[in-house]
Amino acid sequence: GLLYGNGDAVIGINPATDNVAQSIRLMQMLDEVIHKYDIPTQSCVLTHVTNTREAIEAGAPVDLVFQSIGGTEATNTSFGFGLSDLAETRDAALALERGTVGNNVMYFETGQGSSLSAGAHHGLDQQTCEARAYGVARHFDPLLVNTVVGFIGPEYLYDGKEIIRAGLEDHFCGKLLGVPMGCDVCYTNHAEADQNDM
């Protein structure tokens, strides 16, 4: 991503593992690169919030805390955390005082369909659940909230048109609710979509 100038707000890595030691190594590597080249940015390893708390306790250089969030308690429980986990880890990150401007130490990902796929929507539609997720995000004063709605797959968003519609809904809904909203251009390979749709 850096080759294309991506990652100006944050350089993030998805470790594709729940191994805390590996996440710490990635955090240290990113911290070294940022300091060596004096890059005016911050880093985030996209590991579970409880792993990040462990990393902080082990002395890791954590700039941003990541977590995928949903709009119901049951959705977040299915993701393996509660709001108290977000609060405790946010407090731990703030205590590190690594930020140069502001206290925005949280990075969240969301996207329509997660509450439905978890059987945790309580009869609400996808967009209502998504709007509730932005309420959760706003409470924690995040640096960035990103919808990754294309990752939900054709079980909930069948094709490129539906993915684009949902991404626009998410983006505008997030903006209306006052969160720093982004939209990841993504889709699953088994959806009726391709790069030309995005």
Regions found by a protein language model. Give the residues of each.
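Anaerobic metallocofactor- and corrinoid-dependent redox/one-carbon enzyme cores
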Residues: 2-3, 8-198
